Structure formats: structure tokens, C-alpha cells
């Protein structure tokens, strides 16, 4: 796991009895940043004696930095390792002129905290499972949601997600392009 994983990652890993091996980038100059490269991941996978079940990264990081997801996904898949992404601050990445969303760049599993960068109430999120991921992922995801999720989901949050889905399908990409253009002009 990248060293900048969200603090809830550790209790979840402990509950699931997972051994976590921390990954540090060669260029470790940032305080909140942990911009791992494909080379960092490859080096780790070459020198480890026990192949991990997955590489877990936070992307984008808390400062908005993005890793080269496609290259990292290639390294993971060449080594038979799954790539799991905490995309908490990047739900909008799918709607850039060229998608930078982890699922489009090779991630096997990805969670978007829609409430952070999309018009959704707090707690609203999307869990994406790649169609090429192992078949057990869907069943395991349902079990995990039963363990970690609520038995009484907020209908307001579900409605906000549904409304957001409609907005994403209809006009969000155009509005994002327009806003990005305006911000670029201000620079």
C-alpha cells in the first residue's frame, strides 16, 4: 500500500487480518504526497519474497497529484497482482477530455467518494469492479459491504447518487470542460 493511504485503511486491514507492506517512492520529498511510479512498484515486486494479493494506492493524492496509473496497472498485471485504487478525490477523472479514471487505465477495483468532488451528499460513493477482475470480486464485495456498510442506507444519499448519475450522463462532461477552460484562462 502507498504510505499515504487513508487512515481507515489500517483498521480495515487489521479487521481482515491483512499484512500491509508499505510502499515508498524513490522521490520521497513530499509530506502528504506519495507519488509512486511504475518503477517503484516493479522494484518492490521484484525484491519481495511473498507476492502481495494487491497493490493499494490513493490516487489522486490529497494534493491532487496523479500517478501514471496505466503504467502501474501494466506492472501489476504482468506480475499477477491486482491493482486497487482509493479514488476518493478523483470521481471527476472519468469526465476529463481524456479520461484519467483508474478503471479506464487498468485498475481492478476502485472506490470513488462521490461526495468529495461531485454533487452528492456526504457518504455517497461508488464501488467499481473491473469486468476482467476475478469472478469472486462481486461476491466478496457484497460480503464486505454487509460487514462494513449500513443496514439502513440513507435514502437521501441514494437519491443524491441517482441524481448525480443523471447529471453525469447528460451534461457534466461539458460543464467540466467549460469550467476547466475558464480556470486555465485565469492562470
Predicted regions and their residues:
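Conserved PLP-enzyme active-site core in the AAT-like
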Residues: 1-187
Amino acid at each position: 500500500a502507498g504510505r499515504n493511504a487513508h487512515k481507515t485503511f489500517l483498521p480495515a486491514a487489521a479487521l481482515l487480518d491483512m499484512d500491509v507492506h508499505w510502499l515508498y517512492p524513490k522521490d520521497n520529498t513530499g509530506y502528504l504526497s506519495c507519488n509512486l511510479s511504475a518503477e517503484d512498484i516493479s522494484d518492490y515486486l521484484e525484491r519481495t519474497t511473498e507476492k502481495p494479493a494487491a497493490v493499494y494506492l490513493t490516487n489522486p493524492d490529497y494534493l491532487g497529484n496523479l500517478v501514471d496509473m496505466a503504467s502501474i496497472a501494466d506492472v501489476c498485471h504482468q506480475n499477477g497482482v491486482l491493482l486497487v485504487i482509493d479514488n476518493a478525490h478523483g470521481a471527476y477523472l472519468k469526465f476529463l477530455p481524456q479520461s484519467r479514471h483508474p478503471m479506464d487505465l487498468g485498475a481492478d477495483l476502485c472506490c470513488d467518494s462521490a461526495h468529495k468532488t461531485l454533487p452528492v451528499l456526504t457518504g455517497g460513493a461508488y464501488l467499481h469492479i473491473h469486468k476482467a477482475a476475478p469472478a469472486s470480486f462481486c461476491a466478496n464485495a457484497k460480503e464486505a459491504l454487509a460487514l462494513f456498510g449500513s443496514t439502513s442506507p440513507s435514502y437521501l444519499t441514494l437519491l443524491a447518487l441517482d441524481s448525480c448519475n443523471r447529471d453525469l450522463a447528460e451534461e457534466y462532461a461539458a460543464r467540466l470542460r467549460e469550467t476547466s477552460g475558464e480556470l486555465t484562462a485565469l492562470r
